[in-house]
Swiss-Prot record:
The lineage of its organism: Eukaryota, Fungi, Dikarya, Ascomycota, Pezizomycotina. Gene3D superfamilies: Zn(2)-C6 fungal-type DNA-binding domain. This is Zn(2)-C6 fungal-type transcription factor pigI. Zn(2)-C6 fungal-type transcription factor; part of the gene cluster that mediates the biosynthesis of azaphilone pigments (MonAzPs), a complex mixture of compounds with a common azaphilone skeleton very widely used as food colorants. Acts probably as a negative regulator of the azaphilone pigments (MonAzPs) gene cluster. It comes from Monascus ruber (Mold). Residues 42-74 are annotated as: Disordered.
Length: 812
């Protein structure tokens, strides 16, 4: 009885809750009885067989004779049998391990079976030598949980054991563990105990979905939360990667996919001055003194309107040019907010500068100067009072902040929150048709600005992994009309009829994108809700999303680069932004069902759709990467690939990493698979291989790119070790098929540029070799661009690159 006294001491020390105390006491008492009954002088006491209920029934006069039908042996564990789940018949089975119910995994012993079930994983009788270890494991678990409660912290509901952190959850965990401990003593009692422990578990939603409460990180200098659909939360859900990458600065450190751990640390961008007070209070005259001569200002204004896609529909070009002329005539009489708007236009124009001349100062220096002047104009004009041009100036400033960093910045989201609240204060969430004193021109411009704010809110909130700030029920503002700036101005008494939907305008793009954003926002609301959505709700939103994308005008529908020969860079990028948003919405809607779909056919559509969308995302990433290289069609527009766009690529990368991680752990290397599954795995590896190349090149200037390169490189290395080298070489030579093997979801063929840049076993030219060694900083300037004449393939060259001098600038 000594174990009972020890357990009582533990209970008295760590059990402040009466329900928890009773659960723990019950657990240790039952475990102690089992130990006392089973463990003697180093051997097991004989057990009496369980009572035969059928024989007892025969002795009763009122009972009918027993059925002569032969009982079907139960091969699955008790919990899998009750839930009708697939069981691999191990001890414990994989399903119970994944659900955190390892200690509750018990089997009903058929008549005449061997006295003990052998644990195939350990090669020893389960429940005999393993019984003290189970009790010790349970004691350590409860001690840890009680320490957490005693420290005043609420244990996370996402920890593997127990299933939840409430007192009821502790009771269920204790009952389940006691049932496991009693399994070896009496099979009949074990079944009853396991059934009672599983009753409350059956009430939980099936299948066991991925965590929908997100991830929270609490550190000394920072506390951060992201929703479960954020790419970092998905990455954190891969346990092996979570342990390996506790710090994103860790390197992969293994061939043939070396991580960029030796690269220099990216510099921290400046924080938004308007949020943190990093500005000087100056007068209006001092602000005007920073204005450049008009010819140089004209050049910057022209640059802005030529490249207006980064900040569309904020400024009405016709009206702005009239006000621009009046400003040069009477600069001191111009409202300070309009001057801030002009500095915003000039700042973006300087950021867009592609060519530098002796007459134009350094554009980067101008960006810093004009960024400061925008803040000073907003402060002098008291932006909280919401004077005219306030929101327009703030939106230009928001675009400037997006260009300051290649990584996600929560400060930008906070700045957007200021803009949203000012827009609500100015009534932009109510359609101007309710207010007759607002002119048709002002009403239409308010609709344009509000549409842009709604879009920024939804996309930026998803980028930082938080719920959006604007709800659909709070606004009735109509869509802006498809009008050119030349169609109306401030003198218009009524708005003209809109242009046909096939006419490509900045407003057409905003309207088409916002219709997908509206469904995207509903998806974000559904998956960030505290109430778990039902699968029919998910499928209904899936259908709405597909219908909305099909309604996008044909000119904005994505098409291969080979069919876009006559289209400009602006049109190509608009198509790509829309299709990336569509695929991102698909991934966010379905990714929680990817793992359950492997054992439950009801969710096969979600897995196939999510993986196909992620493959599409990385296919577009590879196309965009190649077209923005020197000589590519989008090279001059490469700066438009902002952190908002890259966040979609991060999501696609992590989803395919999760898919590959499941294949690495669930599928034996020599397992027979269908051609569809093998083809899908090859597509996933090929897509991650291409994505790894992109992230590796960007890792010098982006922390997020470095983390993505580390993760994808680690998984690719493990995939190469597990599967046959011949299959991996086949992956290196393959191009994505035109049809996905899943559910008939089409995967577009790679462009000619993409196919030519894909890894193939051909002699490598010097630019191709440098593509895989950007972090090495090796000077190859004295070598020509002719082929090296090597017979090695890309995988061999990647392995060789580990011996290159990565920390030294050594000429070759």
């Amino acid at each position: 009885m000594q174990p009972r006294r020890e357990s009582g001491g533990l209970i008295a020390r760590f059990a402040p809750d009466i329900r928890l105390k009773s659960a723990v006491a019950c657990l240790f008492n039952r475990a102690s009885l089992v130990l006392a009954r089973r463990v003697g002088d180093g051997c097991l006491h004989p057990r009496s067989p369980p009572r035969d209920r059928t024989a007892m029934a025969d002795n009763s006069n009122s009972s009918p004779p027993a059925s002569r039908r032969r009982e079907k042996p139960q091969l699955s564990c008790t919990l899998c049998r009750r839930r009708k789940l697939r069981c691999d018949r191990r001890q414990p089975c994989e399903t119970c391990v994944r659900r955190g119910l390892s200690l509750s995994c018990t089997y009903v012993r058929p008549p005449g079976a061997a006295p003990e079930r052998i644990d195939r994983a350990q090669g020893r009788p389960a429940g005999v030598e393993n019984l003290p270890e189970r009790i010790g494991q349970l004691e350590r678990l409860i001690t840890t949980l009680m320490d957490t409660v005693q420290a005043g912290k609420t244990p996370s509901a996402r920890e593997p054991m127990p299933a939840d952190s409430t007192a009821a959850g502790f009771e269920r965990a204790a009952a389940a563990a006691a049932a496991a401990a009693a399994a070896a003593a009496a099979p009949g009692e074990a079944v009853d105990a396991a059934d009672s422990a599983a009753k409350e578990e059956e009430e939980e939603a099936a299948p066991q979905l991925s965590d929908r409460f997100g991830r929270i990180k609490i550190e000394k200098m920072e506390t951060a939360y992201v929703e479960s659909t954020h790419w970092t939360a998905i990455l954190d859900g891969i346990a092996e990667l979570r342990d390996h990458f506790r710090d994103e600065q860790n390197a992969v450190g293994s061939a043939p996919f070396p991580g960029p751990g030796a690269a220099a640390e990216p510099a921290e961008p400046d924080e938004p001055d308007i949020l943190f007070g990093n500005y000087r209070c100056v007068s209006k005259d001092e602000i005007l003194s920073a204005m450049l001569p008009r010819p140089l200002v004209d050049r910057l204004v022209t640059e802005y309107f030529i490249n207006k896609d980064i900040a569309p529909v904020i400024v009405h070009s016709v009206t702005f040019l009239r006000e621009y002329e009046r400003f040069w005539e009477h600069p001191r009489e111009t409202p300070i907010m309009w001057i801030g708007l002009l500095f915003g236009v000039m700042c973006l124009g300087a950021a867009f500068q592609r060519q530098r001349s002796s007459q134009m100062p350094d554009p980067q220096q101008l960006v810093r100067l004009y960024r400061e002047k925008i803040i000073q104009c907003l402060v002098v004009g008291k932006y909280a009072k919401c004077a005219p041009y306030t929101l327009e100036t703030l939106l230009l400033y928001l675009n400037i902040e997006y260009l300051q960093s290649e990584d996600t910045r929560v400060e930008t989201w906070i700045l957007l929150g200021v803009i949203v609240r000012l827009a609500l204060r100015m009534g932009y969430h109510r359609d101007a048709s309710h207010f007759p004193h607002i002119s048709p021109f002002a009403a239409e411009m308010r609709r344009r600005v509000w549409a842009l704010i709604v879009q920024f809110d939804c996309l930026t909130s998803a980028q930082v992994g938080l719920p959006r700030m604007i709800r659909d029920s709070q606004s009735d503002t109509a869509e802006p009309r498809n009008l050119l700036d030349e169609d109306f101005d401030e003198n218009s008494t009524a708005l003209p009829l809109p242009q046909p939907s096939t006419v490509q305008t900045p407003v057409q793009y905003i309207v088409a994108k916002n219709r997908i954003v509206a469904v995207f926002g509903r998806i974000c609301d559904l998956i960030t809700s505290s109430n778990a959505p039902s699968y029919p709700e998910v499928m209904q939103l899936d259908e709405t999303l597909h219908d909305t994308y099909r309604s996008v005008p044909g000119g904005l529908q994505m098409r291969p680069m080979t069919r876009s020969l006559t289209d400009g860079a602006t049109v190509i990028l608009r198509r790509m932004y829309i299709v990336l948003l569509y695929h991102k919405a698909v991934c966010m809607l379905h990714h929680r069902y990817m793992i359950p779909a492997r054992t439950d056919g009801r969710y096969a559509y979600s897995r196939s759709t999510c993986v196909a969308a992620a493959l599409q995302i990385l296919s577009h990433q590879w196309t965009l990467h190649n077209e923005t290289q020197p000589g590519g069609r989008l090279y001059e527009e490469r700066w438009k690939v902002s952190s908002l766009v890259k966040s979609t690529f991060f999501l696609g990368t992590t989803i395919l990493c999760a898919e590959l991680d499941c294949s690495l752990h669930k599928e034996p290397a020599d397992a027979e698979q269908s051609p569809a599954e093998t083809g899908l795995r090859q597509q996933v590896i090929q897509a991650l291989h291409n994505s790894y190349t992109v992230w590796l090149q960007a890792s010098d200037s982006s922390r997020e790119a470095r983390l993505a390169a580390d993760v994808s490189g680690l998984l690719l290395t493990r995939a190469q070790r597990k599967w046959r080298p011949a299959e991996m070489r086949q992956v290196g030579n393959m191009a994505m098929s035109s049809e996905s093997p899943f559910m008939g979801v089409s995967i577009p063929p790679q462009s000619a540029t993409m196919a030519s840049a894909a890894p193939v076993e051909q002699p490598l030219s010097m630019p191709q070799l440098l593509q895989f060694n950007t972090a090495a900083h090796i000077d190859y300037s004295d070598l020509g661009a002719e082929p090296l004449g090597l017979s090695q393939g890309v995988d061999d060259m990647l392995a060789m690159s580990m011996t290159f001098p990565r920390m030294f600038n050594v000429p070759v």
